A protein has these predicted regions:
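Conserved small-residue-rich beta-alpha loop and adjacent elements
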Residues: 125-158
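N-terminal Rossmann-like NAD(P)+-binding subdomain of aldehyde/semialdehyde dehydrogenases
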Residues: 1-138
Length: 158
């Protein structure tokens, strides 16, 4: 296998290490050291995420869908290597990881289609009823708008 784990945190396009680390014993028994992010590194990652949010929020629905489909394409193109890395890191059988990979790419493509359809916007419009009693109803419009980056704490076991 040609993949060598970085053991670092990817922050704003750069692999960043800290002095604190932990060691994991993957299936091969060879120890791998992984960097533990400092509070400052987490802060820098949040700043980078905010900057990315600002620029990404200017992209079209088509561009966003294309990005998700491109990610799915890359995962599929690198499928064998991803499976090999996953089995060596976790000990899970290849069939399980291939299933997880298929689920992931399927969800990415589903989300891409959801974006293209515009369903996520959940636009609503309640027209004005000026003659409504006991009080008139104003023209009400609701549109979903992104507010910024989201931190996700997910499983890291594979």
């Amino acid at each position: 296998m040609s993949f060598i784990p970085q053991g670092a945190n990817l922050i704003n396009g750069n692999w960043v290490r800290s002095q604190d680390s932990f060691t994991s014993q993957p299936v091969s028994g060879a120890p791998q050291s992984f960097s533990v992010a400092t509070e400052e590194q987490v802060h820098q990652a949040c700043i980078a995420a905010e900057a990315a949010f600002v620029s990404f929020s200017q992209t079209s629905r088509q561009q966003r869908a294309e990005l998700l489909n491109a990610i799915a394409d890359e995962i599929e193109a690198r499928g064998d290597a991803i499976t090999e890395i996953g089995t060596s890191e976790t000990g899970l059988p290849a069939a399980r990881l291939q299933g997880e990979r298929g689920r992931t790419t399927g969800q990415l493509r589903l989300f891409a289609q959801h974006i293209l359809n515009g369903d996520y916007l959940d636009r609503r419009h309640d027209g004005a009823l000026p003659d409504r009693q006991p009080l008139p109803r104003p023209d009400l419009k609701m549109v979903q708008r992104p507010v910024g980056p989201v931190a996700v704490f997910g499983a890291s076991n594979f």
